[in-house]
Amino acid sequence: MVKIFIDPGHGGSDTGASANGLQEKQLTLQTALALRNMLLNEYQNVSVLLSRTSDQTVSLTQRTNAANSWGADYFLSIHMNAGGGTGFEDYIYPGVGAPTTTYRDIMHEEILKVVDFRDRGKKTANFHVLRETAMPALLTENGFVDNTNDAEKLKSSAFIQSIARGHANGLARAFNLSKNAAALYKVQIAAFRTKANADSLAAQAEAKGFDALVIYRDSLYKVQIGAFSSKENAEALVQQAKNAEFDTFIYQE
């Protein structure tokens, strides 16, 4: 059993970065909850614990103590950035070697495959959550809330889902997680070779009330609006999508 500890940065009285109508503490929690659901619903032999599951104040020491006491195999701290930049970057503790560096390289690559952010690079820092954890640890900074372009992306629930998906893909690859045997019925409305086209259609679907997710697989950006264990539920969503004038089909995976 692989034990993944997910740390949504900030929370409660600690808002984190705030700009353009966004609060970091809300974005990190949304991303972490989506990531947890992906891992637990889609993969075998993985256990997930979050440092917080609501808007509560949790100290840095409480976060690392919880991960250490639980015996986590990996500590993942999710953040959004501020300070005038743009894009994605991640951090590990200075001077550490494998497997921390190996996991970081995989996570960095998989996140940027599906998240439309500029690559700001792989960095090191003496952050508490990287220093005081007894297992490999990574802190990701997913866009700048004070950058207009980044902020517009972060306001989209579909984009938050894509951030979570990138993290999930990275964890699955880093820890060789196996997919659940039970196939899901997935509802897809399109597939594109360019991410911009997929993001545009996802935004259109979201505007019509669908939960859209852009997934990069088989060299295509696929726009998915649902995944179900029941084929009947998938077919019901297909009809809703067709009524909204989307070309839709179901596939199993």
Curated annotation (Swiss-Prot):
UniProt main location, coarse: secreted
Known EC number: 3.5.1.28
GO biological process, one term: cell wall organization
Matches recorded under InterPro entries: MurNAc-LAA_cat (IPR002508), N-acetylmuramoyl_amidase_3 (IPR050695), SPOR-like_dom (IPR007730), SPOR-like_sf (IPR036680)
PROSITE patterns listed in its UniProt record: SPOR
Region (2 X 35 AA approximate tandem repeats) location: 184-253
Top enzyme class: hydrolase
Subcellular location: Secreted
Pfam families listed in its UniProt record: Amidase_3, SPOR
Catalytic activity: Hydrolyzes the link between N-acetylmuramoyl residues and L-amino acid residues in certain cell-wall glycopeptides
Keywords of the record: Cell wall biogenesis/degradation, Hydrolase, Repeat, Secreted
GO MF term set: N-acetylmuramoyl-L-alanine amidase activity; peptidoglycan binding
Sequence repeats: 184-219, 220-253
UniProt superkingdom: Bacteria
Domain MurNAc-LAA: 4-172
GO CC, any one term: outer membrane-bounded periplasmic space
Residues spanning the signal sequence: none
Record-annotated SPOR domain positions: 179-253
Job description of the protein: Hydrolyzes the cell wall of M.luteus more efficiently than that of B.licheniformis and B.subtilis. The C-terminal region, including the repeats, determines substrate specificity.
Record-stated family: Belongs to the N-acetylmuramoyl-L-alanine amidase 3 family.
Record's protein name: N-acetylmuramoyl-L-alanine amidase CwlM
Species assigned in the record: Bacillus licheniformis
Taxon lineage: Bacteria, Bacillati, Bacillota, Bacilli, Bacillales
Gene: cwlM
